């Protein structure tokens, strides 16, 4: 289940994201949709990086009764990548949501020898997302 906090004026259909979340975990996930400036501020505050990014994830520790964590998406980045790659903003949001969910579940592409990327490709295929998103996973 997704607790969706849309802080933008963009309408995003999260039906597919709900299916992905349910498939990956029985725990609730918070999804926050932000603009680039809000994302930049959060990235600076939590990671010391003074620029925006497409997705951030913040896991919650403490047991199976708490939400899994929070995933933040920059709608500006989602929209730009979707246009560049020729797919919908929902498809791009799904890729970034998958990426964030896997981080919440303990995957870390910086250290895991490609396990997260492989899992992302598997989920892209499973949920019928455009194959162009598989190429996109190489850049995340």
From Swiss-Prot:
Cross-referenced InterPro entries: MetalPrtase_cat_dom_sf_prd (IPR023091), YbeY (IPR002036), YbeY_CS (IPR020549)
Cellular component terms per the entry's GO annotation: cytoplasm
PROSITE patterns: UPF0054 (PS01306)
EC number(s) stated in the UniProt entry for this protein: 3.1.-.-
Protein's GO biological process: rRNA processing
Binding site for Zn(2+): 99, 103, 109
Main location: cytoplasm
Swiss-Prot/TrEMBL cofactor(s): Zn(2+)
The keyword Hydrolase is assigned to this record: yes
MF-aspect GO terms: metalloendopeptidase activity; RNA endonuclease activity; zinc ion binding
Keywords carried by this UniProt record: Cytoplasm, Endonuclease, Hydrolase, Metal-binding, Nuclease, Ribosome biogenesis, rRNA processing, Zinc
Cellular location(s): Cytoplasm
One Pfam family matching this protein: YbeY
Cofactor comment text: Binds 1 zinc ion.
Similarity field: Belongs to the endoribonuclease YbeY family.
Function, in words: Single strand-specific metallo-endoribonuclease involved in late-stage 70S ribosome quality control and in maturation of the 3' terminus of the 16S rRNA.
PANTHER family (alphabetical): ENDORIBONUCLEASE YBEY, CHLOROPLASTIC
Name of the protein in question: Endoribonuclease YbeY
Origin species: Wolinella succinogenes (strain ATCC 29543 / DSM 1740 / CCUG 13145 / JCM 31913 / LMG 7466 / NCTC 11488 / FDC 602W)
């Amino acid at each position: 289940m997704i607790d969706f906090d849309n802080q933008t004026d963009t309408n995003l259909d999260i039906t597919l994201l709900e299916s992905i979340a349910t498939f990956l975990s029985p725990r609730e996930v918070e999804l926050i949709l932000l603009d680039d400036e809000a994302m930049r501020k959060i990235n600076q505050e939590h990671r010391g990086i003074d620029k925006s990014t497409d997705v951030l994830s913040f896991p919650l520790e403490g047991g199976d009764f708490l939400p899994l964590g929070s995933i933040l998406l920059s709608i500006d980045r989602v929209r730009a990548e979707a246009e560049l790659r020729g797919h919908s903003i929902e498809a791009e949001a799904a890729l970034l949501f998958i990426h964030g969910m896997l981080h919440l579940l303990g995957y870390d592409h910086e250290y895991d020898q490609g396990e997260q990327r492989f899992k992302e490709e598997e989920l892209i295929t499973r949920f019928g997302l455009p194959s162009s998103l598989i190429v996109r996973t190489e850049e995340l």
